[in-house]
A protein has these predicted regions:
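N-terminal export/assembly segments and adjacent metallocofactor-ligating motifs
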Residues: 1-211, 247, 323
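Glycine-/small-residue-rich active-site loops that bind phosphorylated ligands and cofactors
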Residues: 83-84, 250-251, 334-335
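A short, well-structured juxtamembrane/interface segment
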Residues: 56-71, 223-234, 311-318
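A generic secondary-structure signal marking the coil-to-beta-strand transition
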Residues: 174, 239-241, 326
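Active-site phosphate/pyrophosphate-binding segments
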Residues: 200-204, 208, 212-310
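Short catalytic-loop micro-motif centered on adjacent basic/acidic residues
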Residues: 77-80, 243, 328-329
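Extended redox/cofactor-interaction regions of prokaryotic respiratory oxidoreductases
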Residues: 96-159, 259-345
Length: 345
């Protein structure tokens, strides 16, 4: 029996304290991991078989066939890489250059805009270690880490004691949830759960900005002004605040302008940071690697040494336009993450 420490790639937390017992390359027991991590690691098997036309082949034949397809393609697409290593991502970028391919990942239809804003220094961010050691006000906005990242609250954001938070969550941390339903995370936040209607995030942000500015907050859905004023007072007192932004927030907004306005006034009144609730364990890595190479986090097209960027180069728009004649999918499953009407193309 072999026992060692491993990094779990079940979500974006990348917990590095996982103990695993394995025998003959089969994982028998997983310790320390959450339910998501245990399921993720136990389903791990040996290397995938190589197939060409649904028939088993050796590795060399598979590589040769894939290379031939890409070489002969007029408009190839490389997609995925959110569950790939940095080294793989950098090689994929070089391959996209060589084949004049469109290159994109799942961030183009989820948290990509937020990550890009962080990399462009338009929003202030921090590390999970900073949050564990310093955070006193934590907001989960359109996010439910109790289900999506089960060790988030216990290991990083709310329950643990940190170097500057020795008294723990009972006395030194305030957790707030803003969401359309009472999630498991919202239940932990207790009275600091602010339930808004679907699509109501922009109005709530405007009302919160008004409250932070000393004005009476108003919403068309009649959210109690007293509760918004109470929230504003908590935020103004934050010494190290953080907003964990999830898909529930991003999908409600037409653009990031309300987020920019909120973060601006929060940092005039207090000290606030924003962290995207990334699901795939290395989506952020792909965004950073592509940004370092091209200045963009996704939706790029390489063409004769030039880089083009725009919504038309997203995986969704490329497939809808039916211009892709070959696709290399790496570490992703477009059939599960894209609408059937798009992925079938």
């Amino acid at each position: 029996m072999e026992k060692n420490y491993y990094v779990c790639t079940g979500c974006g937390l990348l917990c590095d304290d996982i103990e695993v017992e394995s025998e003959k390359n089969i994982i028998n027991k997983v310790y320390t991991a959450c339910r998501v991590g245990v399921a993720h690691m136990k389903k791990a098997k040996g290397e995938t078989n190589f197939l060409v036309n649904n028939k088993p082949v050796d590795e060399a034949t598979a590589v040769r066939e894939a290379a031939s397809i890409l070489k002969n393609a007029k408009n190839p697409l490389i997609f995925g890489l959110g569950t790939s290593t940095d080294e793989t991502q950098k090689l994929a970028i070089e391959l996209a250059k060589k084949t004049n391919a469109t290159l994109d990942d799942t961030s183009s239809f989820c948290l990509g805009p937020l990550v890009e804003a962080l990399l462009q220094d338009k929003l202030k961010t921090c590390t999970l270690e900073d949050i564990r050691n310093k955070a006193d006000v934590i907001i989960f906005w359109g996010a439910d880490p109790s289900d999506s990242h089960p060790r988030h609250l216990s290991k990083h954001s709310y329950f643990p004691r940190g170097s500057e938070k020795q008294k723990g969550w009972e006395e030194e941390r305030t957790a707030i949830a803003i969401d359309i339903r009472k999630s498991h995370t919202a239940k932990i936040c207790g009275n600091y759960f602010f339930q808004i209607p679907p699509g109501g995030d922009t109005e709530f942000i405007d009302a919160l900005i008004a409250a932070l500015s000393g004005k009476l907050p108003k919403t068309s859905y009649n959210f109690p002004p007293k509760k918004i004023l109470e929230l504003a007072n908590i935020l103004k007192g934050a010494k190290f605040g953080v907003i964990f932004a999830g898909l529930g927030l991003i999908y409600s907004l037409e653009d990031l302008e309300p987020v920019f306005r909120l973060m601006k006034i929060l940092n005039e009144k207090a000290n606030f940071h924003l962290v995207p609730m990334v699901g795939h364990y290395n989506m952020r890595g792909f965004n950073e690697n592509l940004f370092a190479e091209t200045g963009y986090v996704n939706r790029v097209k390489f063409e004769d040494g030039m880089v083009k960027h725009g919504p038309e180069y997203s995986v969704v728009e490329s497939l809808k336009a039916k211009t892709v004649d070959a696709a290399l999918i790496i570490g992703s499953d477009p059939l599960s993450s894209l609408p059937r009407s798009v992925s079938k193309n």
